[in-house]
Regions:
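Class I SAM-dependent transferase core
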Residues: 3-20, 24-26, 37-94, 132, ...
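Residue-level signal for inorganic ion chemistry
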Residues: 59, 112, 196, 237
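Glycine-centered, small-residue-biased loops immediately flanking beta-strands
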Residues: 190
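Helix-to-beta-strand junctions that scaffold the AdoMet/dcAdoMet cofactor pocket
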Residues: 186-187
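Short strand-turn motif at the edge of the Rossmann-like AdoMet-binding core
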Residues: 195-199, 223
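Short loop/edge segments at beta-strand edges and connector loops
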Residues: 72, 150-151, 222
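Conserved SAM/SAH cofactor-binding pocket of Class I
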Residues: 83-171, 179-180
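SAM/dcSAM-binding transferase cores
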Residues: 205-261
């Protein structure tokens, strides 16, 4: 499959990160070095696109049997799954050990893992068929930095208390529920990166109490342009202390009885 939208995004991203050549440089060796950097990055982009293309093909193939996603058209998958997943790639920073709760078909962590082979991603989902798909993709794309685990969030959190530098979550739950699911997993000083749409403010207003209980602090809300008409917001929560080990609550209470206020 041709991934022109994703390709353009990755190349433009490299330019914004100062990888493009400065034609006004006074030093030939500096120009040569930047040429080398640009060539190397284009080689990386080719490798990325090969993996993303395989990912797309198998997503569509498995989707016919297991209903992994409602988004299947090539252009939509590139924008709403691939580009959307990697928009906040710059926020990961020094986070090396990252957890994705409710990973579904692998978004956002599989795209992030393709771009960040130096970071370890642990993907968790309670639906076994989704984990089976993720394991297939891990092997197909040789993603040695990805592990998939079949588990309920509550059980996984109890056994992995404050084990991760960061958590990412996309299209999983409202902020009060999401905070209770993820902050117990995050080390002090680590971050939650929550992908949200334009109505994120209402959710934030409802989670001040659970943030206080679980020692989380709103750091920032990062805005990205997904398309000319659509924006994506990533809510960044920092873990500033140790949270009580009794969270998240059992029995699906974080979702059914969220702590609001």
């Amino acid at each position: 499959m041709q991934l022109d939208i994703l390709k353009d995004y990755l190349i433009n991203k490299s330019c914004k990160n100062n990888n493009k050549i400065d034609g006004n440089s006074l030093y030939q060796n500096e120009v040569s070095s930047k040429n080398d950097e640009k060539s190397l990055y284009h080689d990386k982009v080719s490798l990325y696109l090969t993996k993303f293309s395989l990912y797309y093909d198998k997503l569509i193939e498995w989707n016919s049997k297991f209903n992994l996603t409602a988004i299947t058209q090539p252009q939509e998958v590139q924008i709403k799954h691939f580009v959307d997943s990697i928009l906040p790639d710059d926020l990961l920073g020094e986070s090396k050990n990252i957890c994705d709760i409710g990973c579904g078909a692998g978004f956002p962590s599989i795209p992030l893992a393709i771009l960040n082979p130096d970071k370890k991603f642990t993907l968790v989902d309670s639906v076994n068929k989704k984990i089976s798909f993720i394991n297939y993709i891990i092997e197909l794309l040789d993603l040695q930095n990805v592990t998939a685990i079949h588990s309920r969030v509550e059980d996984f959190a109890k056994n992995n208390y404050q084990s991760f530098d960061a958590c990412v979550a996309r299209a999983l739950a409202s902020m009060p529920t999401l905070v209770e699911y993820t902050l117990p997993l995050i080390k002090k000083g680590g971050y939650l990166f929550a992908y949200k749409g334009k109505n994120y403010n209402e959710e934030l207003e409802q989670c001040s109490k659970i943030l206080e209980i679980l020692k989380g602090k709103l750091q920032e809300v990062k805005q990205y342009d997904l398309t000319e008409d659509e924006k994506r917001y990533v809510i960044v929560i920092q873990k500033i202390g140790d949270c009580p080990k009794k969270y998240p609550r059992n029995g699906n209470k974080p979702r059914l009885q969220p702590i609001l206020g």
